[in-house]
Amino acid sequence: METTAAATAAERRRPLFTTEELGGRAVYRVQAATVAAGILLVLYYRATRVPAAGEGRAAWLGMAAAELWFAVYWVIAQSVRWRPFRRRTFRDRLAERYEQNLPGVDIFVCTADPQSEPPSLVISTILSVMAYNYPSEKISVYLSDDGGSILTFYALWEASIFAKKWLPFCKRYNIEPRSPAAYFSESKVHHNLCIPKEWALIKNLYEEMRERIDTATMSGKIPEEMKLKHKGFDEWNSDFTLKNHQPIVQILIDGKNRNAIDDDRNVLPTMVYVAREKRPQYHHNFKAGALNALIRVSSVISDSPVILNVDCDMYSNNSDSIRDALCFFLDEEMGQKIGFVQYPQIFNNMTQNDIYGNSFNVSYHVEMCGLDSVGGCLYIGTGCFHRREILCGRIFSKDYKENWNRGIKERGKENINEIEEKATSLVTCTYEHRTQWGNDIGVKYGFPAEDIITGLAIHCRGWESAFINPKRAAFLGLAPSTLAQNILQHKRWSEGNLTIFLSKYCSFLFGHGKIKLQLQMGYCICGLWAANSLPTLYYVVIPSLGLVKGTPLFPQIMSPWATPFIYVFCVKTLYGLYEALLSGDTLKGWWNGQRMWMVKSITSYLYGFIDTIRKCVGMSKMSFEVTAKVSGHDEAKRYEQEILEFGSSSPEYVIIATVALLNFVCLVGGLSQIMAGVWNMPWNVFLPQAILCGMIVIINMPIYEAMFLRKDNGRIPTAVTLASIGFVMLAFLVPIV
C-alpha cells in the first residue's frame, strides 16, 4: 500500500507542462550589445554635428528625432527577446489524473454582421468547437450575434440539426480539422480515411445545408416554412431592426436534456444563441459588451469554470486544444498562478510569400514567447482560454482553490423556458447600469483594443498567462486578403493600443509595482505601433528630398562616422531576416513584410495616430469597424497570385503612391545632379541618401507596376496617380533648411 501511495504521489508530482528556453541567446545578446553601442554612436553624431542655420539644420534635427524614436522603440522591442521560452504539454498525464473529473468549458463565438461575416462561415466555426476531443456534456457553445440577424439564427438552427451527424462522424474517424468547410476543402487528403458512402453522405448533407444558408443570406430572408421549426424565429417581427430590438436568448440544444443526443446516441453539447438588447440611446460597447453578456448568460445556463472565446472565422484546427490548455490550469505546482492560456492567431488563407505580411510569425515565435518568460503573454482577443473567475475580477491569491466541478451538476427544477427568461434579463441595455461590468468585472470598456487592456488588468491582479504554439495549429482563420482590409485592421489595432498607452492604463503607470518592467515594456511594443508613423514618414521623405536639393543628412561614406550607421542598419536587418526565416517566413515573405511595415506605418498607423489624438482632445468618438472576411472572385484570384490589390481612390492609396513616386523622382533627379556636379560637393557625401532612396524605390516596385503597368481592376486608379503626381510637385516646394 505504501509503495502504491508513493507511486501515486510521484505521478502527481510529474508536471503537466514544461518550459524550454529558446536557443541562440548568446548570439542574440552579442548582437544586441553591439547594435546598442552603434545606436549610441549614431545619436552622439547627430547631437555633435548639427549644421548651421540655413544649411539643413531643421531637417537634421528632424532626422535626429526620428532616429532617437527608433532607438527607444528598438530598446522596448528587446525586452521580450532576452530569454524567450517555449512550452510543452503532456495530455497523457492529464488523462491519467483527471479524465473522470474534467471541468466544463464554455465556448464564446462572436459575430457582428452577416454580410461581412457570412453565417455559413460562422457555423463552420461553431461545428468545429462542438466537436472537440472532449466529453460533449461538458461543452457549451454560445453565439453572440451583435447583428441581431434572423439569418444568423437560422444558420445556427441548421447547424444544430447537422451536428447530430457531424459530431459522430468526426469522432468515429478522428478527423482533423473539424470545421466541415475546411475538412471538405481538403477532401483529397481525407477521403480515403473514411467509408466512401458515409463520407459522401455527410459531404452532401453539409453542402445542401450551406446552400440553403447562402441562398437565405443572398435573398435576405428565410423560407416562411422554416419559421415554424423553432419558437425562436418569432422574435423577429416588423419592429425589429439592427440597432433597436429586444434581447434574445434561445437554447437550441440543451445539453442537460437526455433527449438531446446525436445519431450515435451520445449527448450533444449545449448550443445557445444570444442577441443583446439594442436601443439607440444606449451604447453597446462593441465586442467587449458582447463578451460580458455571454459571461452572464452562461453563468445561469452552464457556468463552466473555463471559458474559451474565438472569433467567428477562427475555426478549431486541433481537437485536443482544450486538453492542452487544461494542462496549464490543472498542473499541481504551477497551474494555480495561470489565469489564461493564449493560442496564436494563425491564418489558413496565407499566400506562399505572405503578400500582406499577415503571418505574425516573428511575433508568435519570438515576442510572445519572450513575454511568456516575464510574466505572461498578451490576450489577443481570440483563441484564449480563461478561468471564469478572472473574468469576474478575482485577484490572485495563493489560498484560492478553483472549483473545477462547477456547472457540471444537474439542473434543478427550472425548465428551459425559465432559464431562457432568466438569461434574457441579463442582456438588457440597462442591466449594467451602475455596476462594475466593463470596469472591475468582465472585459474592459472604453477601448477599441478591449483584449489588450483586459489582459493587462488580469496581469496586474497578480495572475500569469501562458502562451502555447503547438505544431498543429489550434485555430485557423481568415487573414485580410486585400490591402484595404489590411490597412483597416491595423488602423483599428494601432489606434486601440495607442489609446491605452495614452490613458491611465498605460502599462508603465497601471502596471508599476504590479508586473515586471520587461512585461510593461512588452505591452508597449504594440501600444506604440501608431507612434512609429511620423518618424517613418519623415525618414522615407526628407532624406530623399535632401538628395535632390543638395542637403546632406548623413556622414559621407568614407567617414569613420558612417560605420555606426552602416553597422546598425545591416546587423538589424540581417538579424530581423534571421528571426523571420527561423520563424517560418520565406525570404520573399520577409521582403514583403518590410514593404508592408512601411505601408502600414504611413497609412494605418498614421491614421490611427491622428484619430487617437483627435479622440484625446474630444474631436471624435470611438468607433469599431468590422473587417470583411470575404472578397470578390477577381480580388481573391489576384490575392492567390500575390498581386497587391488597390482598385479604389482611397486617401491611403494616395499616400502610398506619393511616397513611392517621390522617391523615384528624387533618386533619378538626385543622381543626375550628382553626376553633373551641380552641388559642388564630393559624390560620396550623398551616397548614403542615394542608397536609402534606392532601397525605398526597390521595395516599392509593385506600387509602380500598379500605377503604370497593370491593366486589371486592382491597379491604382488614374485619379490616385494624378493626385500623387500633384503632391510630389508640392513636396518639391518644401524647403530643406
UniProtKB/Swiss-Prot annotation:
Coiled coil: none annotated. It is a multi-pass membrane protein. Signal peptide: none annotated. One of its GO terms (molecular function) is cellulose synthase (UDP-forming) activity. GO terms for biological process: cell wall organization; cellulose biosynthetic process; plant-type primary cell wall biogenesis. Its EC number is 2.4.1.-. It is found in: Golgi apparatus membrane. It comes from the Eukaryota. It holds the Pfam family Cellulose_synt. InterPro entries: Cellulose_synth, Nucleotide-diphossugar_trans. The chain crosses the membrane at residues 26-45, 58-78, 528-548, 551-571, 654-674, 683-703, 716-736. Gene3D superfamilies: Spore Coat Polysaccharide Biosynthesis Protein SpsA, Chain A. Keywords: Cell wall biogenesis/degradation, Glycosyltransferase, Golgi apparatus, Membrane, Transferase, Transmembrane, Transmembrane helix. Its main location: Golgi. The keyword Cell wall biogenesis/degradation applies. It is an enzyme of class 2 (transferase). One of its GO terms (cellular component) is plasma membrane. The active site is at 146, 451. Belongs to the glycosyltransferase 2 family. Plant cellulose synthase-like E subfamily. Thought to be a Golgi-localized beta-glycan synthase that polymerize the backbones of noncellulosic polysaccharides (hemicelluloses) of plant cell wall. This is Cellulose synthase-like protein E1. It comes from Oryza sativa subsp. japonica (Rice).
